């Protein structure tokens, strides 16, 4: 099979059913925790696989993973659409974490193309505050050269999430 199946002839209802089935399968594999778009949950699993430690409950404020040394890591993901360098990550409403790991996935293929680890103070310094949303929102342009490049580490962790899967893309 060369890429994703052709979905152009499916009705909207069928597309929604397919999305629900995919999210259900990802939940069954323990990779997502909500019925929201799964990329954020997958990104958290990537960081957990890379760093070990504990995946915090969804209700935990300000960070997603606590690594084995006790560092609190906020995970942000972007992907699935062509956004360019002006693409925005989800908002930061507090900075009670040690580092943020930003994962950027390619549109359509979801290959992990970039991963940056940035300390909380640096994120807060570059992300403008919006009173309307009561948060700070960083763009890809702002974070792509900050902190450490952890792309190789995160790609290796991403590959471990489905070790028995068959690669359908040739």
Mark where each language-model region is.
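Nucleic-acid endonuclease domains
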Residues: 1-170
């Amino acid at each position: 099979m060369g890429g994703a199946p052709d979905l152009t002839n499916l009705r909207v209802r069928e597309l929604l059913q397919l999305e629900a089935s995919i999210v259900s399968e990802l939940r069954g594999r323990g990779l997502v925790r909500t019925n929201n778009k799964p990329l954020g949950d997958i990104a958290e699993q990537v960081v957990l696989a890379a760093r070990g430690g504990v995946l915090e409950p969804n209700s935990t404020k300000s960070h997603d993973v606590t690594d084995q040394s006790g560092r609190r890591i906020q995970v942000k993901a972007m992907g699935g659409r062509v956004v360019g360098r002006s693409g925005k990550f989800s908002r930061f409403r507090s900075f009670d974490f040690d580092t943020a790991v930003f994962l950027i996935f390619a549109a359509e293929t979801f290959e992990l193309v970039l991963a940056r680890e940035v300390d909380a103070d640096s994120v807060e310094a570059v992300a403008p505050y919006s009173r309307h949303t009561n948060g700070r929102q960083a763009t890809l342009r702002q974070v792509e050269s900050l902190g450490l490049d952890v792309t190789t580490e995160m790609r290796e962790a991403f590959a471990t999430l489905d070790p028995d899967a068959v690669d359908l893309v040739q």
